[in-house]
Amino acid sequence: MSRADEIFIQNCKDILTNGTWDTDREVRPKWDDGTPAHTVKKFGVVNRYDLSKEFPILTLRRTYWKSAVDELLWIWQKKSNNVHDLRSHIWDAWADENGSIGKAYGYQVGVKHHYPQGDMDQIDKVLWDLKHNPASRRIMTNLYTFADLSEMALYPCAYSMTYNVTGNKLNAILNQRSQDMLAANNWNVVQYSVLVMMIAQVSGLVPGELVHVIADAHIYDRHVPFVEEIIQNEPRPAPKFTLDPNVDDFYKFTLDSFTMEGYQYSDFSGKIPVAE
């Protein structure tokens, strides 16, 4: 069993057994038919993934890792807020007629800020600090800009990363305000694991731990049967995920720079509804 499978099963069982339902109050999300999308949740879930040991991708069901990485590059490398720059259509529901999601995600990454070393955006400052001041305890990014929230199609769910160099390892903490466990949990874990691996490689470091801190880890009411089915599936060993070792520039990574070997997963044919 992969560590990602083990953590997912533990989280979901805990939420379903010990979680709190919000059926006693009004909620913002709705299903396609207009019905309120209620959830059962746990507060303050913390998961640790040791990237030096294995790549944390689910085998209980397939995670479309190439689409997840494409979205990662869209945000952190292209710094785009336009869905036309994405291969998938995941974000289409939140885009305007021009394909924009407003001042969200990639837009925030690309905003330049003034530092003593010069003007840099968030990811470039991380890369600069890791090269020139790896002992710093101030290496972080934050996409939750209050002044711009009114111009975002969707408030950032995974919103901040804190990077820390310990020895020759790059560790990171991902803070997430809200997590749809079925639809997006492993998607986000895969993305930010890859981001840590990319940054580590171009900074002359090796990947360490990704610590995922989730404020509100929830399962939607209509997702419960799917979750109950998936956590009963047969888990398999974690596959091997590698980056092209010749890439030494963060902006030179492409989808072809990543390889997954031996990825086996259980079949799952359910059509998962998404609340908006």
Report each predicted region and the residues it spans.
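Terminal, non-catalytic protein-protein interaction segments that mediate quaternary/complex assembly
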Residues: 1-276
